[in-house]
């Protein structure tokens, strides 16, 4: 019997993880227990005055991209991502100036202090 993983993250994240697991011979059952929904009417005032944006998740990256609209709008700004997955999500959304902190919020804070 093959191993089976229960994936409870939001659907998109679970689907991406299921692909990786399938490549390793692990079947997945996707049952999201949460849904990430950006706030209606959210705005980013003063974005042009910011040195960088710190992002802690791929969901945050997708929400930011949705607020900015289609590329290339705002894709030139510096993004400091908590880890590789968030950084890769930013690149997929068309952001050009992305740096990964390596995986946790302490590393992200250190990167921000060193860079800004």
Regions found by a protein language model. Name each.
Residues 1-116:
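Signature of uroporphyrinogen-III synthase
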């Amino acid at each position: 019997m093959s191993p089976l993983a229960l994936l409870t993250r939001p659907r998109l994240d679970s689907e991406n993880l299921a692909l990786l697991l399938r490549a390793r011979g692990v079947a997945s059952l996707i049952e999201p227990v949460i849904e990430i929904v950006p706030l209606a009417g959210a705005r980013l005032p003063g974005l042009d005055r910011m040195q960088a944006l710190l992002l802690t998740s791929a969901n945050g990256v997708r929400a930011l991209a949705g607020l900015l609209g289609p590329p290339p709008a705002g894709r030139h700004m510096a993004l400091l991502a908590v880890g590789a997955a968030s950084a890769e999500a930013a690149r997929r959304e068309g952001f050009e100036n992305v740096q990964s902190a390596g995986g946790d919020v302490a590393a992200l804070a250190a990167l921000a202090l060193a860079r800004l």
